[in-house]
From Swiss-Prot:
<dbReference type="InterPro" id="IPR022528">
    <property type="entry name" value="6-phosphogluconolactonase_YbhE"/>
</dbReference>
<dbReference type="GO" id="GO:0005829">
    <property type="term" value="C:cytosol"/>
</dbReference>
<protein>
    <recommendedName>
        <fullName>6-phosphogluconolactonase</fullName>
        <ecNumber>3.1.1.31</ecNumber>
    </recommendedName>
</protein>
<keyword id="KW-0313">Glucose metabolism</keyword>
<comment type="pathway">
    <text>Carbohydrate degradation; pentose phosphate pathway; D-ribulose 5-phosphate from D-glucose 6-phosphate (oxidative stage): step 2/3.</text>
</comment>
<dbReference type="GO" id="GO:0009051">
    <property type="term" value="P:pentose-phosphate shunt, oxidative branch"/>
</dbReference>
<dbReference type="GO" id="GO:0017057">
    <property type="term" value="F:6-phosphogluconolactonase activity"/>
</dbReference>
<dbReference type="InterPro" id="IPR050282">
    <property type="entry name" value="Cycloisomerase_2"/>
</dbReference>
<comment type="function">
    <text>Catalyzes the hydrolysis of 6-phosphogluconolactone to 6-phosphogluconate.</text>
</comment>
<keyword id="KW-0119">Carbohydrate metabolism</keyword>
<comment type="similarity">
    <text>Belongs to the cycloisomerase 2 family.</text>
</comment>
<dbReference type="Pfam" id="PF10282">
    <property type="entry name" value="Lactonase"/>
</dbReference>
<dbReference type="InterPro" id="IPR019405">
    <property type="entry name" value="Lactonase_7-beta_prop"/>
</dbReference>
<dbReference type="InterPro" id="IPR015943">
    <property type="entry name" value="WD40/YVTN_repeat-like_dom_sf"/>
</dbReference>
<keyword id="KW-0378">Hydrolase</keyword>
<dbReference type="GO" id="GO:0006006">
    <property type="term" value="P:glucose metabolic process"/>
</dbReference>
<dbReference type="InterPro" id="IPR011045">
    <property type="entry name" value="N2O_reductase_N"/>
</dbReference>
Length: 331
């Protein structure tokens, strides 16, 4: 399995393309000069395209991925209704979802042969909208509205329209600030990192009565931490055994173990990392974690070790200025 790491650096308007070797080393393949401040990225489900959100002209760019080395070739673009804070796709590669924090909206852009078209749906009134996360069954879009302490739930139709579910939302504790989400491989639980109180919520997607319920909230900060809480990103290993979340003030990655059924998290440790880690990601083997330091202008590669899933640094690499996003493609 070949793996490629992509990092987005908005301050220098660059995408760095790296080959991830089996021993965890990175080899630079390409540096792409992008037409704007590149931030969120996602790889298409068929692994053929990289979609990138850019500012200040709000667009989604599509780059075709070269199969042998992961290099990028510009393929197309489409306008977005708001500044893209987070982008994702449905599991079938038919739609791109864009969340806009500044405009407080989520949008749906159809894909035709991998290329984005004209936006078909925009839902507004989502203050601090920070991500759009499709459920494992490809039916429900979970959209955290950070400033409203709620996660809105929408049903995705076959033609890309969103309709409010019943219930239309779930709420966090006041001041939590729900931000990014991941789902357990068993499709029974979702995990949301809360930016403003640096906690992680465990959501049972459907209990026996059909309700969505928060079954655990866990503080992700060390007990002696007294600074401003500022959590950012969250990811889970492909086998569902280890979960990671980062905080930008403390510049740490918190390591969690996950119970076999996915319902319970436990803190296993804290890994110091690059300054102000805005984004990180995991490789597809579940062996490596790659973190970006927004203020260090470097990325670091960590090996995931042992039953606890603790992190051991393998190397660090200079990238563009202000790196904010990391994605990994297996091909």
């Amino acid at each position: 399995m070949k793996q490629t790491v992509y990092t987005a650096s908005p301050e220098s308007q660059q995408i760095h393309v790296w080959s991830l070797e089996a021993d965890g080393k990175l080899t630079l393949v390409q540096v792409v000069d992008a037409p704007g401040q590149v931030q969120p990225m996602v790889v298409s489900p068929n692994k053929e395209y990289l979609y990138v959100g850019v500012r200040p002209e709000f667009r989604v760019l599509a780059y075709r991925i070269t199969p042998d080395n992961g290099a990028l070739t510009f393929a197309g673009e489409a306008a977005l209704p708001g500044s893209p804070t987070h982008i994702s796709t449905d599991h079938h590669g038919r739609f791109v979802f864009s969340a806009s924090y500044n405009q407080g909206c989520v949008s749906v852009t159809p894909l035709q042969d991998g290329l984005p078209g004209e936006t078909v749906t925009v839902v507004e009134g989502l203050e601090g909208c920070h991500s759009a996360n499709i459920s494992p069954d490809n039916r429900t879009l979970w959209v955290p509205a950070l400033k409203q302490d709620r996660i809105c739930l929408f049903t995705l139709s076959e033609d890309g329209f969103l309709s409010a579910q019943e219930p239309a939302e779930v709420t966090t504790v006041d001041g939590a600030g729900p931000r990014h989400m991941v789902f357990h491989p068993n499709q029974q639980y979702g995990y949301c990192v809360n930016e403003l109180n640096s906690s992680v919520d465990v959501w049972e997607l459907k209990d026996p009565n059909g309700n969505i319920e928060c079954v655990q909230t866990l503080d992700m900060m060390p007990q002696d931490f007294t600074g401003v809480r500022w959590a950012a990103d969250i990811h889970i290993t492909p086998d569902g055994r280890h979960l990671y979340a980062c905080d930008r003030t403390a510049s740490i990655i918190t390591v969690f173990s996950v119970s076999e059924d996915g319902s319970v998290l436990a803190v296993e440790g804290y890994q110091p990392t690059e300054t102000q880690p805005r984004g990180f990601n995991l490789d597809h083997s579940g062996k490596y974690l790659i973190a970006a330091g927004q203020k260090s202008h470097h990325i670091a590669v960590y090996e995931i070790e042992g039953e606890q899933g603790l992190l051991h640094e393998k190397g660090r690499y200079a990238v563009g200025q202000g790196p904010m996003w990391v994605v990994v493609n297996a091909h």
